A protein has these predicted regions:
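Short beta-strand segments
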Residues: 123-129, 241, 306-310, 412-413, ...
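Gly/Ser/Thr-enriched, mixed-charge loops and adjacent short helices
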Residues: 7-19, 29, 134-297, 347, ...
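Phosphate-binding and adjacent anionic-ligand microenvironments
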Residues: 304, 325-328, 346, 351-593, ...
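Cofactor-/ligand-binding subdomain signature composed of acidic, glycine-rich
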Residues: 1-49, 53
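N-terminal small/polar loop signature for handling phosphorylated ligands or for N-terminal nucleophile
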Residues: 68-135, 252-319
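Short glycine-rich or small-residue beta-strand-to-loop segments that form or flank ligand, phosphate
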Residues: 72-79, 237-242, 591-593
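Glycine-rich phosphate/diphosphate-binding loops that line cofactor/substrate pockets in enzymes
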Residues: 52-74, 217-234
Length: 628
């Protein structure tokens, strides 16, 4: 425990300058050494002071924003990063000193604390999501189940900066540390186990509501009975590489046991992070190898696997390919596509059985670099696709805006990272993704007592997408993936998806990019038409929840997402290129999405090559614009 006696204003402002502050979270390297791969629990005096001021900033903002709430009940938790509990102690002291009713649950996954916060007034969560182990950060939220929105976040960030830059900032931090009532602090720690149990119970109840799209036991029980019945007839087990994450101490094992689904785990001791945290293909290999091992031992029912990140809100999928007799790692865009397919089919299935689920206006909310395959899937269910800027908060807030316009928004998320958010949740959750796939595999055709035939989810999709000839009763996930719209899309963790630029003025950079792109178009348009049938383009930008089409001035996208959509002669979109500076990392992200024009191997090869070529053109134009 740091005593902060030597803490200075200069140390605070220096640490502040290294922080990334955005609606998605406030992040920096908290490890005392400053090394991002350091697994120490220690932090510097400056970061201890920053942690105290973070707690005060949130409490001051909350008190002003919600002055009508007298007994302000806040839940605090952390993931399993080594510095998490250290930071939590300083935040606790600050919140107690501010007079709030604070409930500390220790380690919890992000979806877990956000489910619990729905019964309270807000939350503070200590996590740096998928970033390396030496990083850590803070997320803030209210009782609506998600992080605070962009506008509120701006106010809070400004308040925090002002506090850190005050002449007496270091003295404020020291006073917060020393003025905390030790008896109250001890009492908070003593109640941790009790509140953790409450937290888990809230999360478990919320899981069933999310999966069945209802709080009504008359709907929940038949849905889960159908899943159990199907799994009994065609056994399915699930494997998970928990990688020492917060999900080691969450509801996963309980939920699978309650639904009679065998659950196999590795790296299931909290805090023992075995490998890199980000759940992208290079780290999903451990789950894939575990599934191979299980099959070699005779556990042939293991069909699905997943690996969460450290805070347990993001997790991508491995499935057992019966066609190839080996595990296959799904790409993030494929995971999101399957989740969207399943949940849209599920809502249509429910509407066939229960009239309250019928809706004339249906939509999904996605981020701007989500592959266009989502539009093709949604169109089959008469569902509109609306796009927001990258950032979970933006996608969640867009969904709220759509619901205020009387849209039914069942699913939302960011295809670029595979994260699935299923209403009424407002945060990604891998267990919801797994159960979306289980519903897709298990909810099959049934005959109602009145004789009406209700198509299962996959059969429904095959019919609506014009692929009914591909449906068979004993289908596998291989069969499902064969029916997905085919696209080649840059992976978010690929080295070529990240550029490092010098120009911090993104409006200026994009203005220069526009001139270079327009010149490129004049020089290459005949070639692009000959190579891939591209005949026109449209620029689109996404800032927060707002999308601007037919953009004539690229600079107005500022620090938001900028996308060029390419069209064929029939005015159908067939590819896009995209760019945006990261709000949480020092990186400039780029990607390309290309439609495979038909099911032939030639078309697949051509699309694969064209995606590489188009992304290289795009990246070179950005680099050229940065050098001017």
């Amino acid at each position: 425990m740091n005593n902060l006696l030597e803490l200075s204003n200069e140390q605070l402002t220096s640490s502040l300058s290294k922080m990334i502050l955005s609606a998605s979270g406030w992040r920096t390297i908290f490890a005392k050494s400053g090394e991002e791969q350091d697994n120490t629990t220690e932090i510097t005096d400056a970061l201890a002071g920053i942690s105290l001021l973070i707690g005060k900033s949130f409490c001051d903002w909350f008190s002003k924003e919600f002055s009508q709430i007298k007994n302000k009940r806040i839940v605090l938790a952390c993931d399993t990063r080594p510095t998490g509990k250290t930071i939590a102690d300083y935040v606790l002291r600050s919140v107690i000193a501010s007079g709030f009713d604070i409930r500390y649950v220790g380690v919890a996954s992000a979806p877990e604390i956000m489910a619990y916060a729905r019964k309270l007034d807000g939350f503070i969560y200590i996590s740096a999501s998928h970033n390396p182990i030496g990083h850590n950060g803070i997320k803030f939220g209210l009782n609506d189940g998600g992080v605070i929105d962009g506008e509120k976040s701006k106010v809070l960030i400004e308040s925090f900066k002002n506090l850190c830059n005050q002449d007496d900032a270091s003295e404020i931090a020291k006073n917060l540390f020393s003025s905390c009532n030790q008896d109250l602090l001890n009492e908070v720690y003593q109640k941790t186990e009790f509140y953790k149990k409450e937290c888990l119970q809230s999360y478990s109840e919320f899981f069933y509501e999310i999966t069945a799209a209802s709080k009504d036991d008359g709907i929940i029980k038949p849905i889960f009975s159908s899943i159990k019945k199907s799994i009994k007839e065609n056994p399915i087990s699930v494997a998970c590489d928990l990688n020492g994450s917060a999900r080691c101490l969450s509801i996963d094992s309980k939920i699978f046991a309650e639904n009679e689904i065998p659950f196999f785990t590795i790296n299931d001791e909290a805090f023992k992070i075995a490998h890199e945290i980000i759940p992208e293909p290079e780290n999903l290999i451990y789950c894939a190898d575990f599934m191979k091992k299980l099959h070699s031992e005779g556990n042939n029912s293991v069909k699905l696997g997943y690996m969460p990140d450290c805070d347990g809100d993001r997790g991508n999928i491995v499935y057992w390919s019966d066609d190839e007799n080996q595990p296959k790692i799904l790409k993030a865009q494929e995971v999101f596509s399957l989740s969207v397919l399943s949940e849209l089919a599920f809502m249509d299935y429910l509407a066939d059985k229960f009239p309250q689920f019928k809706s004339e206006k249906k939509a999904i909310s996605v981020n701007d670099p989500t592959s266009m395959r989502i539009e093709e899937i949604a169109k089959c269910f008469n569902v509109e696709v609306h796009r927001a800027e990258v950032g979970e908060a933006n996608v969640v807030n867009l969904a709220r805006e759509l619901r205020n316009q009387n849209y039914q928004v069942r699913i939302l998320g960011e295809g670029s990272n595979g994260g699935t958010i299923t209403n009424p949740a407002a945060v990604r959750d891998p267990i919801n993704t797994i159960f979306a796939l289980l519903k897709l595999l298990c909810l099959k055709d049934e005959v109602l007592p009145n004789g009406k035939i209700v198509l299962g989810l996959f059969h429904r999709w095959c019919k609506f997408s014009g692929n009914e000839s591909l449906y068979r009763e004993n289908f596998t996930l291989d069969d499902v993936t064969k029916t997905l719209p085919k696209y080649i899309t840059t992976g978010v963790s690929e080295p070529r998806a990240i550029l490092h630029i010098q120009n911090s003025n993104h409006s200026d950079l994009k203005s220069k990019y526009q001139k270079n792109f327009e010149k490129f178009w004049q020089e290459k348009k005949s070639y692009l038409f000959d190579q891939y049938g591209i005949s026109s383009w449209q620029a689109v930008c996404n800032n927060g929840t707002k999308q601007t089409n037919s953009l004539t001035d690229f600079s107005v996208s500022a620090r938001g997402g900028l996308k060029i959509i390419f069209y064929n002669e029939e005015k159908n979109p067939i590819s896009f290129i995209w760019m945006r500076g990261s709000g949480t990392e020092s990186a400039f992200r780029v990607m390309c999405d290309v439609k495979v024009l038909d099911n032939s191997e030639i078309s697949l090869t051509k699309a694969t090559e064209f995606e590489k070529e188009l992304l290289e053109y795009h990246s070179n134009l950005i680099k050229l614009s940065d050098s001017i």
